[in-house]
Amino acid sequence: MRKTLGDMPTDASSSPAELKAVATAGAAVPVSILMPIKNEEGNLPRALGSVAWADEIFVVDSGSTDGSGEVAKAFDAQVVQFKMQGTWPKKKNWALQNLRFKHEWVFIMDADEVLPPEAEEEFRQIVSGEPNDVVGYLINRRFMFMGVWLKHAYYPNWNLRLFKHRLGRYEKLTDSATGSGDNEVHEHVIVEGETGRLKCEMDHFAFPSIEVFVEKHNRYSNWEACVAMDRFTAGNIGVSKWMDRLAVACKDPLSLRVKMGIRRQLKHWSVALPCRPFLRFLYVDLWQRGFLDGEPGFYFARLHGFYEFLCVAKTKELKRRFKAAAKNDEDA
């Protein structure tokens, strides 16, 4: 029987033995955890410790070179190796399609995320309760930055993570944009059915340092530039056609798919706005009230403005290369 956690230490450096030492015996929750990783030895004890009550845990590894596999096995997790073949499917969709889950419900979390102790009972009630029309649940994430929870910037941040695995898949955005690597980073889960919201909230330690923030967003800006170039080389779609697509999507204004679609269309339109970096800073600092988070909120907003600057600069660089290559072909 899997051990449940209780009051666990929150220090990511705690060993599996230390985390299990504070665990108490209890009935496992009939849910499958899916955690994609690569070189997450430092984060895994905290993340896996927070879901030690789950009956089944899959860790899908993209060839870690640290001790991630050993740490995962110490928590009785099943470690599955994944190697991306071309562009699709990426890691999470591959896992949803190929892993033999013991349970109907699956919860997807990253190694830098942590569930609170009260999540155990809420998950138990959902997966063991009376059947209803809800097939997926969104969870709110609390971003940690510079050692504090950002209570305004990037909050609330709802993400669909708990769902019936046969009825949910990550969306496929574009074939050509693979800058985000082998894992679904910008994609969202689309489920066939109604959704609800969890009461518990999940802590997200995505940026343990500014260095990590810069490294991640340097990669993400590569992805954004590739997506922008994909649209650029395909020709100008035009605002009228975007409006037509939006009108079709809005036939079901309450669906999660539509809400994400509208947000994504607005993001597409915002690409053409002047002063994007400054506008992104204002969005996080003023609209999302990041200024109420004090100095960490200010730096968080400034860094997101810098991220937009990288997206703009890299896109312009790729366009220059594309035009230069086209000119050389014409002259040849």
Regions found by a protein language model. Give the residues of each.
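Active-site nucleotide-sugar/metal-binding loop of Leloir-type enzymes
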Residues: 74, 93-105
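Short, structured coil segments at secondary-structure junctions
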Residues: 53, 74-76, 158, 191
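A conserved acidic beta->alpha catalytic loop
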Residues: 50, 61-71, 84, 110
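Cell-envelope/extracellular polymer assembly enzymes that use nucleotide-activated donors
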Residues: 30-32
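Acidic helix N-cap motif at the loop->helix transition within catalytic regions
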Residues: 45, 66-75, 118
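Short, well-formed alpha-helical segments that are part of the catalytic scaffolds
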Residues: 16, 35-56
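Catalytic-site signature of metal-activated, phosphate-bearing donor transferases
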Residues: 6, 89-90, 96, 116-322, ...
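Short, acidic/glycine-rich phosphate-metal binding loop used to engage nucleotide
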Residues: 81-88
